[in-house]
Design a protein with these regions (language model features):
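A short, amphipathic beta-strand motif
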Residues: 32-40, 50, 150
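Short strand-edge motifs at loop-to-beta-strand transitions and within beta-strands
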Residues: 79-83, 135-137, 146-148
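Acidic, glycine-anchored loop motifs typical of Ca2+
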Residues: 101-109
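A short tyrosine-centered beta-strand micro-motif
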Residues: 91-97
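Short, flexible loop/turn segments at beta-strand junctions in immunoglobulin-like
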Residues: 40, 85-87
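Surface-exposed loops/turns
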Residues: 77, 89-90
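Beta-strand signatures of extracellular beta-sandwich domains
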Residues: 49-53, 96
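Bacterial N-terminal signal peptides
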Residues: 8-19
Length: 155
C-alpha cells in the first residue's frame, strides 16, 4: 500500500507531461524559435535580411531555395537588428544575413563581383574570395529557443 501511494505521489509531483516525450510533443505543436542577432552594421539604412537553408542547394543567395527568410529594421543606437523565426522545426540550418541598404532584396555587387553591401554567416567563419561552405555556417536549432549572433562584414 505504501509503495502504491509513493508512486502516485511521484507521478502527481512530476505532472502529466514530463521528459523528452512531452518536449517532442510541444515542439511538433508549436515549433521552435530562432533568434538571429546581427551586429556590426555600418549605418541604419535599409533592413537586415536573413535566409535559412537546410542544405547546400542554393547556398547562400538563392532565396527560392531557402526554407525561410525574413527581414528586420535596424536599431538606430547600436546599429544592430534581430530577425525572429517562429514555428520552425528543430534541426540544422545554414544561416546567412545581408545588410540590404537599398531594400532591393539582393546582395548588390560592383563590376568585379565584390559585394557592395554587408553580409555575414552563422558561426562567423572566415570569408575569403567566396562564401564559406554551407557546413561552416550551420547552427543546430533546438526548442524552445535558439539564439545566434552574426557579425556583418563589408568588403
Amino acid at each position: 500500500m505504501k509503495t502504491g501511494l509513493r508512486i502516485a505521489l511521484v507521478l502527481l509531483a512530476i505532472g502529466p507531461c514530463s521528459g523528452s516525450f512531452c518536449a517532442a510533443r510541444a515542439q511538433s505543436e508549436t515549433g521552435c524559435i530562432l533568434r538571429v542577432h546581427v551586429d556590426g552594421l555600418r549605418n541604419v539604412k535599409g533592413v537586415v535580411g536573413v535566409l535559412l537553408f537546410r542544405s547546400a542547394d542554393g547556398w547562400p543567395e538563392d532565396v527560392s531555395k531557402s526554407v525561410r527568410h525574413d527581414a528586420s529594421p535596424i536599431a538606430a543606437g547600436p546599429r544592430s537588428a534581430t530577425v525572429v523565426f517562429n514555428g520552425i522545426a528543430a534541426g540544422d540550418y545554414g544561416i546567412v544575413a545581408l545588410h540590404d541598404e537599398n531594400k532591393n532584396m539582393k546582395l548588390d555587387r560592383n563590376l568585379f563581383g565584390i559585394p557592395k553591401e554587408g553580409f555575414g554567416f552563422a558561426n562567423n567563419p572566415h570569408v575569403g574570395l567566396g562564401p564559406p561552405p554551407f557546413r561552416a555556417a550551420v547552427v543546430y536549432v533546438g526548442c524552445p529557443t535558439t539564439d545566434t549572433l552574426i557579425h556583418i562584414i563589408y568588403k
